[in-house]
Amino acid sequence: LIAVLLIACDSEKKEQKDQINKENKSSAAFVLDNAKNSVEWTAYKTTEKVPVKGKFKKVEITSGGEGNSVKEAIHNAEFSIPISSIFTSDSSRDYKIRKFFFGVMENTKLLSGKLVIENDSLGYADITMNGITDKLPFTYLIDDKKFSMATKMDVLNWNAKSSLDSLNLICKELHKGLDGISKTWSEVAINITSTF
């Protein structure tokens, strides 16, 4: 009798769980959380402006991100990106960026933001980093079910000079150019794609 009750209760719990999962699935045609999202960046070192490429391996959609078109799904989508998901194909570089750049900032375990589409080619992201929220304009293109955006960010707009100085100090020799000057640029190119 106990075994029958346990099996019956277990089946009831499974049915309730299945019902909750069905309710959480969106009926929207385009769901950003289900898309293949890529957040890639290019920073620069040395006076010759040598590119250093990387990406964030994880992005979480925290609000919105659904619609009956790609544009609708992107517009007003809110996201967060864990700093721990940074990846440059060099684990020692990843550690230095996390500790000596982001680690110097205020409240920056996550980068967060909201995407706003203004017209058929322009938008902006309200990016929160280092305790500061600032507007970052971008250009974008929608090709079938793929959204691509590009922008350039100046980290000084997020009061990140001390973070930049900290990273440049720890990477002093690695960031020296042919002229013998060590430089870490404040400009970062960002490319984001979402394929639905």
Q: Language model features by range: what are they?
A:
Residues 1-7:
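Sec-dependent bacterial lipoprotein signal peptides
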